[in-house]
């Protein structure tokens, strides 16, 4: 029953007070089970059918799908339940206590993005779900801030095919229809150590890596020349050499050298295509030094994403907001949800607040976000 729901600000407060940090470091990583239970209970109170899905390969993480109505199509509203870790020394407030000051709601996850679920629940007070002609789905995922394992697993296993989806990441209520992807790799070269007084008795991994870097930089130039997407501020795929380490002493031939790099592909480029381009670039080194060069993923890759600009979802949201869709450089779960249906990224709060100390969401977003959620539900589930 709707009258069982706490007030909007109390829902928000409870979400922020329930830690759900995602981290690759096990000591910092937390289960999102308590947060999922909170959400599940609230959506059940509204009459939704709720499924909780354990996410394999995680440390006790879960997805939640709340649904009302049956049949084909409908609308999916999605978001992630986890936050990044916080630096206690840089926060001036308790990250897990929602505080309001000077038109801002402070707390870890206020903008990115646990607060989005408070907006959905509050908006549903004014929606008569019994009159929906198409189903409404609410998806809460796990581990977006690390591996995106929740969205990946949901997209791989669900049979749902809504008409469209909106992911409520903080975009300042500016609709986003495309973003670049991200792949990160470790290039490792195994040489052969020896005393520097006799270089011929060893194989210097740093020298081999120098050769490999030359080929990687040529790939960077080729990506810039070959691929263009003018809507992006940087209208081509970028390649960055981010970290390198090799050797342990000035008088030893370096036995091992490792380079960490990333590529940010534009929409339309497949991960297989990128892996092929990287392997082709490094082929001369691999062929000259068989078995000494390896390429490994540092993190699960994220493809680029694009919603067709002429899709009904884009047209409807642009009309409702009076704003054109944008493209951005950061990554979201959209590439995985997009495999199910056309998807937009659109939510309250600023991306500039994501992962920042004293994270906040401006209260000016409360009314328009609530109204927007009601409008999109009416349009895609009542018509």
Curated annotation (Swiss-Prot):
One of its GO terms (cellular component) is cytoplasm. The active site is at 82, 144. The keyword Zinc applies. Zn(2+) 2 binds at residues 112, 145, 355. It is an enzyme of class 3 (hydrolase). InterPro entries: AcOrn-deacetyl, ArgE/DapE_CS, Bact_exopeptidase_dim_dom, Peptidase_M20, Peptidase_M20_dimer, Peptidase_M20A. It comes from the Bacteria. One of its GO terms (biological process) is L-arginine biosynthetic process. One of its GO terms (molecular function) is acetylornithine deacetylase activity. Belongs to the peptidase M20A family. ArgE subfamily. Homodimer. NCBIfam families: AcOrn-deacetyl (TIGR01892), PRK05111.1 (NF003474). This is Acetylornithine deacetylase. It comes from Shigella flexneri. The gene is argE.
């Amino acid at each position: 029953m709707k009258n069982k729901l706490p007030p909007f600000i109390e829902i928000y407060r409870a979400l922020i007070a329930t830690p759900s940090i995602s981290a690759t470091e096990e000591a910092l990583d937390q289960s999102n089970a308590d947060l999922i239970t909170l959400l599940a209970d609230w959506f059940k109170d509204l009459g939704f059918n709720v499924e909780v899905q354990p996410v394999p390969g995680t440390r006790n993480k879960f997805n939640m799908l709340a649904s009302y109505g049956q049949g084909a199509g409908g609308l999916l509203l999605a978001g992630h339940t986890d936050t990044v870790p916080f630096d206690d020394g840089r926060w001036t407030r308790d990250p897990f206590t929602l505080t309001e000051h000077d038109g801002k709601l402070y707390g870890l996850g206020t903008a990115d993005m646990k607060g989005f679920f408070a907006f959905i629940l509050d908006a549903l007070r004014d929606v008569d779900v019994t009159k929906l002609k198409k189903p409404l789905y609410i998806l809460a995922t796990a581990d977006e801030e690390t591996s995106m394992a929740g969205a990946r697993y949901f997209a791989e296993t669900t049979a749902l095919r809504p008409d469209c989806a909106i992911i409520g990441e903080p975009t300042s209520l500016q609709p986003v229809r495309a973003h670049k992807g991200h792949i990160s790799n470790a290039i490792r070269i195994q040489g052969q150590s020896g005393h520097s007084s006799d270089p011929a008795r060893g194989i210097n991994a740093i020298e081999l890596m120098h050769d490999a870097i030359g080929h990687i930089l040529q790939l960077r130039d080729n990506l810039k020349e070959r691929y263009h997407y003018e809507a992006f501020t940087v209208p081509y795929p970028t390649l960055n050499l981010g970290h390198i380490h090799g050797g342990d002493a000035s008088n030893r031939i370096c036995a091992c050298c490792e380079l960490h790099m990333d590529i940010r592909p534009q929409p339309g480029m497949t991960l297989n295509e990128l892996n092929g381009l990287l392997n082709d670039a490094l082929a001369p080194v691999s062929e000259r030094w068989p078995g000494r060069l390896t390429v490994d993923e540092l993190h699960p890759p994220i493809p680029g994403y694009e919603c067709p600009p002429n899709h009904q979802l884009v047209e409807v949201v642009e009309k409702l907001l009076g704003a054109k869709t944008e493209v951005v450089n950061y990554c979201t779960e959209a590439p995985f949800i997009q495999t199910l249906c056309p998807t937009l990224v659109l939510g309250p709060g600023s991306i500039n607040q994501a992962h920042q100390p004293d994270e906040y969401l401006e209260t000016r977003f409360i009314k328009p976000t609530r109204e927007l959620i009601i409008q999109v539900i009416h349009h895609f589930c009542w018509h």
